[in-house]
């Protein structure tokens, strides 16, 4: 009874635990270079809160919010004092500050609170979401064909999304997604479905339909949320072993389609899966024996033109595999096998940088991974070998030196002939191939108001790369970010990053031949530098109004040329009262070239995201309005517009707009029942 009274008191005193925290605050980054898949995976986690009385170490650490010491404190408290009565009880865990709990709040729930305190909530619920979006100006792809340009998009410029899900956190999840991109002919161009059953005796997890799989450090299967290198320099270094999760994203690649089963007996787990899914791919003309090959996989998901439609489902992929692991409360060791077969051989173009790329119809991966947690640190790693003989390895450690200092260290090596189609381990390259690197990150918190984070990453590429006509190139990247929180409702941050790589640089050279002046193109691999700066200020002016201000800038330079520059400034405001909420932005940007494009996170309708690259010169505006029609029905409307200065068109190719501005609208309604 005393515990319940304490929780009620905490709920009255600390109501801002459930205060709105921006995506940018949680992600801890300016979102530059963050992939669409990363955001989609993060949104899936946010839309399915975890029960703090049922969550295990791997799942909670997978949120990348709590440090090693904080994770230990959480589980020690739960072990010593029993189940949490409410999420407010988390304030009694000594290591968990209010700022940490604000970041954690969107991802957690407490069934004990529902059962004990009698909250009017349902564990099982269904929701249906419908979304429409469109660019208001006409793109060339939707105009009438001309004699010189006859290729056009197949259908209307409206993009549709229909999504349904029923979820009971204890045992069952059913859902489907139907999507059509702008210009596509079929309103069911992409469909996805899943059925998940959990916690039925030794059957821990069964998924039928579409799913992702994350084991070890993501060398073989890395289908989970991870930012890699970011302003969160410690926690994103390590990947948790999450097993299989239903796939509910609108991205049309990077998932399995079939059956996954996960069994648990005491501290042992066994997992098996099979997948049979069609992939988009570029088909080549039949060879002399009539064999049809594909040159590359297509991941855009667009099927708007004749050529894009021809690439749709051109390659059939069959995958199967399994694994076994042993897990204690804070440690895990496991092995995994994965076999992949294609119905057509993959044959890359004959380029030097493609010499070690995958070719053929099958790939086999064998993987060993481990994670061991001490009282102050975690050591982790994975070693994976493909049947080509290539291998990948990730070895790392993260830990809390004391209450003020956290540190991470990671080494990775991916040989040029290592092949993993679902890998997403920590790396500089977008794929885990042809790279060796070592990363060191640090976080220092001298007081509750101040925090600074930094990392240094050195990387080396033993073989040629695309647009790098030389083997054995190298580079480094370093970042420093300062956070200052003068009060509970305001925050100031500044971030500086420097990246150095070796890349191709081309220029024109004049020469004499037969008494005539001619020009030729000279290409040389040379160091390339890019500096970026981001600053952020947020403040809650009243209980209903908050503001955010951002300034970003960059400089880009090859060794032989003068630097080019770009910058952007934006002002946001958000108002909410009762059932209404409104967010607006005005931004100005000016960049000398595309290399200096400025990335800035934008608020969107729920379960959607936007982080466009501002480049050129102009103004950017948007507004997002939401209204709770009743407790079960919510409506969103988003409008955005970019006005460019000193240019007559926007975009290129079939996406070109013949006026210097672009406007987009998006409407969404969600019904919870």
Each model region followed by its residue ranges:
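Sec-dependent N-terminal signal peptides
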Residues: 4-13
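Boundary at the C-terminal end of the N-terminal hydrophobic targeting segment
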Residues: 17-19
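Alpha-helical interaction/regulatory segments in DNA maintenance proteins
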Residues: 29-43, 72, 81-83, 88-124, ...
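Amphipathic, charged-and-aliphatic alpha-helical interface segments
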Residues: 37-85, 104-107, 178-180
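Transmembrane beta-strand segments of Gram-negative outer membrane beta-barrel proteins
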Residues: 118-148, 166, 170-176, 206, ...
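Exposed, low-structure sequence patches enriched in small/polar residues
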Residues: 153-157, 254-256, 310-348, 355-673
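Outer membrane beta-barrel
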Residues: 183, 187-242, 248-280, 401, ...
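A subset of solvent-exposed loop/turn segments in beta-rich extracellular surface proteins, enriched
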Residues: 217, 221-250, 278-310, 359-363, ...
């Amino acid at each position: 009874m005393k515990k319940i009274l304490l929780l009620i008191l905490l709920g009255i005193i600390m109501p801002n635990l459930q205060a709105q925290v921006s995506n940018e605050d949680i992600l801890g980054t300016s979102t530059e270079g963050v992939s669409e898949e990363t955001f989609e995976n993060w949104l899936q986690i946010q839309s399915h809160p975890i029960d703090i009385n049922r969550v295990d170490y791997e799942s909670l650490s997978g949120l990348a919010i709590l440090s090693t010491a904080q994770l230990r404190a959480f589980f020690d408290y739960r072990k010593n004092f029993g189940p949490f009565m409410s999420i407010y009880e988390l304030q009694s865990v000594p290591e968990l500050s209010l700022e940490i709990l604000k970041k954690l709040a969107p991802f957690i729930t407490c069934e004990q609170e529902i059962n004990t305190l009698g909250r009017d909530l349902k564990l099982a619920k269904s929701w249906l979401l419908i979304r429409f979006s469109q660019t208001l100006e006409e793109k060339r792809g939707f105009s009438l064909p001309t004699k010189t340009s006859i290729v056009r998009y197949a259908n209307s410029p409206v993009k549709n999304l229909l999504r349904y899900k029923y979820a009971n956190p204890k045992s069952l999840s059913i859902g489907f997604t139907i999507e059509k991109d702008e210009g596509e002919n079929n309103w069911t161009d992409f469909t996805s479905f899943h059925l998940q059953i959990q916690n039925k005796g030794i059957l821990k997890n069964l998924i039928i339909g579409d799913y992702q799989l994350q084991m070890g450090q993501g060398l073989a299967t890395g289908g989970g949320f991870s930012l890699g290198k970011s302003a969160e320099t410690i926690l994103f270094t390590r990947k948790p072993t999450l097993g299989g999760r239903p796939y509910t994203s609108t991205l049309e690649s990077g998932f399995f389609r079939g059956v996954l089963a996960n069994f648990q007996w005491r501290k042992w787990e066994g997992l098996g899966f099979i997948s049979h899914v069609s992939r988009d791919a570029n088909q080549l003309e039949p060879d002399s024996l009539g064999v049809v090959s594909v040159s590359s996989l297509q991941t855009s998901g667009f099927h708007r033109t004749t050529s894009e439609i021809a690439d749709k489902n051109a390659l059939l992929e069959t995958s199967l595999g399994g694994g076994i692991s042993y897990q204690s409360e804070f440690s895990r060791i496991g092995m995994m096998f994965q076999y992949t077969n294609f119905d057509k051989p993959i044959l890359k173009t004959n380029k030097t940088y493609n010499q070690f790329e995958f070719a053929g119809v099958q790939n086999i991966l064998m993987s060993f991974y481990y994670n061991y947690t001490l009282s102050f640190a975690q050591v982790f790693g994975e070693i994976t070998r493909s049947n080509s003989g290539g291998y990948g390895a990730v070895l790392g450690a993260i830990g809390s030196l004391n209450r003020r200092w956290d540190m991470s260290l990671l080494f990775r090596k991916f040989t040029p002939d290592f092949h993993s189609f679902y890998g997403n381990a920590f790396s500089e390259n977008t794929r885990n191939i042809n790279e060796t690197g070592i990363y060191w990150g640090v976080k220092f918190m001298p007081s509750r108001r101040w925090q600074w984070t930094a990392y240094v990453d050195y990387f080396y590429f033993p073989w040629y790369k695309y647009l790098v006509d030389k083997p054995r190139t190298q580079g480094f990247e370093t970042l420093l970010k300062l956070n200052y929180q003068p009060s509970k409702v305001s925050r100031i941050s500044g971030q500086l990053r420097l990246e150095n790589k070796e890349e191709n640089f081309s220029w024109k050279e004049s020469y004499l031949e037969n008494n005539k002046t001619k020009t030729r193109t000279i290409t040389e691999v040379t160091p390339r530098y890019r500096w970026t700066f981001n600053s952020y200020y947020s403040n809650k002016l009243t209980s209903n109004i908050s503001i955010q201000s951002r300034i970003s800038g960059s400089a880009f330079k090859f060794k032989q040329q003068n630097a080019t520059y770009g910058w952007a400034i934006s002002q946001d405001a958000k108002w909410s009262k009762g059932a209404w909420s409104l967010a607006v932005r005005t931004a100005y940007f000016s960049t000398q070239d595309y290399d200096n494009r400025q990335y800035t996170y934008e608020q969107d309708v729920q379960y959607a995201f936007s982080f466009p690259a501002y480049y050129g010169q102009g103004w950017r505006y948007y507004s997002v309005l939401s209204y709770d029609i009743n407790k079960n029905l919510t409506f969103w409307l988003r409008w955005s517009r970019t006005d460019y200065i000193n240019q007559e068109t926007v975009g290129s190719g079939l996406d070109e707009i013949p006026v210097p501005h672009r406007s987009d609208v998006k409407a969404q309604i969600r019904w919870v029942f």
